[in-house]
């Protein structure tokens, strides 16, 4: 899985990337205290990191690909310092409270976090890896952490992930505390391979802690 992910970034096969940021984040993100620590797993080079930091939060993304991490800072125009700790490379932005940790997410143990934003992590993982991801993620969060999860729903018989379709029953089994807050049709942001496969419905489901 890790090798495949790195290869996609090396080849520029990043059809899931939302260059303009995520609409659902801006519509549904809960208001938190300034300085709240927000965790963004498997963040890629998402501009959502910058948006969250601009709201006054301390944002930490975790990403396997160094190509993605360096691209984020270059595109955002933010200088950074680098530290290496425990096999992970910490890219610490010199503007805003914004850090991206480069390495294997399962080796990342910094905690606790006040909030979680997951748009591209759970849906990137095949079913057999999801429970381990969720267990590890929960270990990094405060017991009362606010959480926002975005899943995708589409006809997976026509095309497979990643990103994968994750159905509501599975979400509730993994995260009973999450409630579905709304849906957005995301045909404009649909990866090209799904459009080529003839998929006509592609929904982002937004889940929040109540």
Where are these regions (language model features)?
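Class I (Rossmann-like) S-adenosyl-L-methionine-dependent methyltransferase catalytic domain
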Residues: 1-35, 45-48, 61-98, 102-109, ...
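Class I SAM-dependent methyltransferase "Motif I" SAM/SAH-binding loop
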Residues: 39-46, 121
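Short alpha-helical basic/polar micro-motif
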Residues: 50, 119
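Gly/Ala-rich phosphate-binding loop of Rossmann-like dinucleotide-binding domains
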Residues: 53-54
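Conserved acetyl-CoA-binding loop of GNAT-fold acetyltransferases
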Residues: 57
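A short acidic, Gly/Pro-enriched loop at the edge of an enzyme's catalytic core
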Residues: 109-116
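A short, conserved alpha-helix within the catalytic core of class I
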Residues: 124-136
């Amino acid at each position: 899985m890790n090798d495949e992910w790195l290869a996609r970034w090396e080849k520029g096969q990043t059809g899931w990337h939302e260059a303009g940021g995520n609409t659902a984040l801006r519509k549904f993100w809960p208001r938190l205290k300034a300085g709240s620590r927000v965790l963004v797993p498997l963040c890629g080079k998402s501009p959502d990191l910058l948006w969250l930091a601009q709201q006054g939060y301390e944002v930490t993304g975790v990403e396997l690909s160094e190509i993605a991490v360096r691209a984020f800072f270059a595109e955002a125009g933010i200088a950074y310092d680098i530290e290496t700790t425990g096999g992970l490379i910490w890219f610490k932005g010199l503007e805003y409270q914004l850090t991206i940790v480069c390495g294997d997410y399962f080796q990342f143990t910094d905690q606790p976090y006040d909030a979680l934003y997951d748009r591209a992590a759970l849906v990137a993982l095949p079913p057999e890896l999801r429970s381990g991801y969720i267990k590890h993620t929960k270990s990094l969060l405060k017991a009362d952490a606010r959480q926002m999860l975005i899943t995708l729903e589409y006809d997976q018989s026509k095309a497979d992930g990643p990103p994968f379709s994750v159905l509501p029953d599975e979400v509730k089994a993994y995260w009973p505390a999450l409630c579905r807050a709304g849906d957005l049709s995301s045909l404009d942001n649909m990866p090209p391979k799904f459009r080529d496969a003839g998929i006509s419905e592609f929904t982002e489901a937004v889940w929040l802690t109540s």
